[in-house]
Structures are given as structure tokens and as C-alpha cells.
UniProtKB/Swiss-Prot annotation:
Metal-binding keyword on record: no
Compartment(s) of residence: Mitochondrion
Entry protein name: Small ribosomal subunit protein mS23
Subunit structure: Component of the mitochondrial small ribosomal subunit.
InterPro entries xref list: Ribosomal_mS23_fun
Ribosomal protein recorded as keyword: yes
Organism: Sclerotinia sclerotiorum (strain ATCC 18683 / 1980 / Ss-1)
Lineage: superkingdom: Eukaryota
Family per similarity comment: Belongs to the mitochondrion-specific ribosomal protein mS23 family.
Principal subcellular localization: mitochondrion
Pfam families named in the record: MRP-S25
Keywords for the protein's UniProt record, in alphabetical order: Mitochondrion, Ribonucleoprotein, Ribosomal protein
GO molecular function terms attached to this record: structural constituent of ribosome
Amino acid sequence: MRGLNLKPSRVYQTAAALLESESISQAPPWYKTIGSVPPSEILTRTQPVQHRGSNGRPRTKKASKLFKPQTIVYEEDRIRQEFFRDHPWELARPRIVLENDGRDGQRCDWTRKEFYALRQEEEIERRIAKEEAEYVGAYFHKGALEVGMELEDKSYEDWKAWATKEVEAANLLKQGAYTGVGAESEDADVLDEAAEADEGVEEPATVVA
């Protein structure tokens, strides 16, 4: 493998050597300028950063954790893990300065009651403000709860009407099955009655001229 070509960066030294050996009789026009103000960078092209070569096998599966952020790790985390691994019972000690009696779990219900009290106070204030506004003439549209109840009632009434029709149809089918007479026999009876009624009606007499 050939090395880097450094001849372009040593053009001034080459010209000086040629002048000293009298190989050239006259200095180039740029000789003094390059000697007084040398270039700040080398004239050769820098080599790009060589990436690590692959193992020869094509990568067909995309990495699933390509866009996953890297885990933030601190030196204190490792020290803390080592400490509690060596002293596991230190985890049972209270670590809050204000509550150092070791009975923090008993305060769970007390904290929940405080939360409920605060929410109840906010709800009462909101209700009083609404009543005062309605007293002076303010009008509020239906809330989400009222709209939801109306939609639920409408759906229930629609279902009730549909269920009533289904029950009536089921009862008719059940009655027909118990009597043992189908719909065809009933239609035949109706046709027979209509025919008998037609026979009972006398035809008008024809007048012969």
C-alpha cells in the first residue's frame, strides 16, 4: 500500500534546493511569497475517517432499539447499588428527615382523607359560585353528565321499543306452535269463508226484451 504523497506540500523546499544546486537560474514568481507567508494547511487531501468494516454478512433485520434513547447512568448509582448490596438492612431505615419514626405507612389513610377533604372543599366552592351566578340571572348549558344521561335514556327507549316488538313476534310464533295449525291452514279457512259468502249472494236477473 502506497503512503501519502507529500510532494505538493514540499514545493518550496524543492524550489530552494533547485536554486542552490543551480538547476534553475531564476526563482519562480511565487518563491518569495511562499517563503514569507507559508500556507496554514498542507496541500494534500486529508484521509477520511475509516469506518469499521462489516463481518461480511448482510444485515437484513433492522435494529429494534435504533431510536431508543441511551440510558443515563451516573457514578453515584453504582456506588449506591454497591452500598445497599453490602448493607441491605439500611433500606428498612427511614430516609426522610421529617418523618424518622419508621411508621410512614400509617399515614396513607391520613393523606387520602386530606385529599378527599380538599376535593370536597373545591366542589362546594364551585357549587356555591354556580348558585350565586344563577341567582343573578346567569344561564349555564347542560353539562357533560346531563347530556350523557339524555343520550343513555334515548338509547334505552329505542332498545325498549325494539325489545317489545321482538317479544311480540316470539309470542306469536309460540302460540302458532302450540295450536298445531299453521298459517297456510288459516289462510285456507279465510278463503273458504269468502267463497261461501259469494255463493249466498243471488245474481241479478237478466231482463229479456
